[in-house]
Amino acid sequence: VYTSARRDGLQAQSLAVSFDGGYTWEKYAGNPVLDRGSADFRDPKVFRYAGADDAYWVMVAVEAAERRVLFYRSDDLLSWTYLSDYGPAGAVGGVWECPDLFPLPYVSGAGSAAGVRWVLLVSLYPGGVAGGPATQYVVGEFDGIRFVPDVAHPCVAADAAEAGEHRIGGIVE
């Protein structure tokens, strides 16, 4: 899934597939697969979410100027259903870019597995200390529908995760 920019200035999410390991790509004839009619809807990250009873695709994207992260679900990568959104929160200078959401296992003080927290990354541009890009992160819970930040530490300030004149859009695989 990628962001397609239309001639009228609007952005939508489209699909392309590769049958040769990523050397060439074939665009889906029915593109776009998700169109909000927005000029700032971009930067999708898609991952497979496995809940207790169901597994499906989750798309994390931004409404950049609104400083919101949007969550969608799909069973087939073609039809998307809105789940929820997060933001604005934390650093809100500039626009939000390149969101990422991933699980992070943690261990207890004794060294045994204790659970999983979810980390939401959002890049800002501008928004960094030096006026350039930066990345902030939020730790919380994701239940397959909604991201809820931890109350004790709702947001780590921009630049705490990443900063620099040309650094933006880190993605965790």
Residue ranges and their predicted role:
Residues 1-43, 48-98, 105-163, 173:
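Beta-rich carbohydrate-recognition and catalytic domains
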Residues 166:
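Cationic, low-complexity basic patches in intrinsically disordered or flexible, solvent-exposed regions
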